[in-house]
């Protein structure tokens, strides 16, 4: 959702217990498959682990805001469980073993090169390895720059919004919420 109202706390994603099904919301405005795959895997983990019930919402703050993340996740067992399952889904121990020998002070080009080689050899997502390295060593700028070297970006936001538009029947959304849906998705005013 690219157009959330100003003043809302920065978040990467959320999962909502809407009626009889979970709804995953991706709010991060990055176009990297690696970022998006982790966010979706993390939110899906909340569902699989039974953290979400009808009427319950879990909003995950920005992972890149390490000070907020560290203080909140240390006391939030569910976030830790969701992170662990998401990381397992995206690379299990293989990814951790691969990046364990990578130097913490590597620059973006080194991270990208190592990520690409390891990804090919082990059928993993190179961008995920780069971000996992950034998370492990709290070196987000280098990890994000490495994604640029990998050229793994796509118009993920556009693709997700197109899928949402194909699958959301606005006629089933309450009249007073249609304008809000149009605003936060950037679809323009609903007639």
Where do the PLM segments sit?
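Active-site hotspot residues in diverse enzymes, especially metal/ion-binding acidic/histidine motifs
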Residues: 1-191
């Amino acid at each position: 959702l690219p157009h959330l109202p100003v003043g809302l706390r920065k978040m990467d994603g959320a999962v909502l217990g809407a009626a009889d099904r979970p709804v995953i919301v991706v709010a991060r405005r990055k176009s990297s498959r690696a970022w998006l795959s982790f966010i979706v895997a993390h939110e899906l983990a909340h569902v699989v682990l039974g953290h979400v019930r009808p009427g319950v919402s879990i909003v995950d703050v920005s992972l890149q805001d390490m000070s907020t993340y560290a203080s909140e996740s240390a006391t939030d067992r569910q976030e830790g469980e969701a992170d662990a399952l998401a990381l397992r889904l995206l690379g299990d121990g293989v990814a951790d073993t691969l990046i364990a020998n990578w130097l913490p002070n590597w620059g973006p080009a080194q991270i990208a090169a190592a990520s690409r080689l390891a990804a090919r050899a082990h059928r993993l997502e190179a961008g995920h390895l780069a971000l996992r390295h950034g998370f492990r060593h709290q070196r987000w700028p280098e990890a994000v720059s490495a994604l640029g070297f990998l050229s793994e970006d796509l118009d993920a936001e556009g693709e997700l919004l197109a899928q949402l538009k194909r699958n959301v029947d606005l006629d089933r959304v309450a009249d007073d919420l249609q304008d809000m849906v149009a605003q936060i998705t950037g679809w323009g005013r609903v007639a």
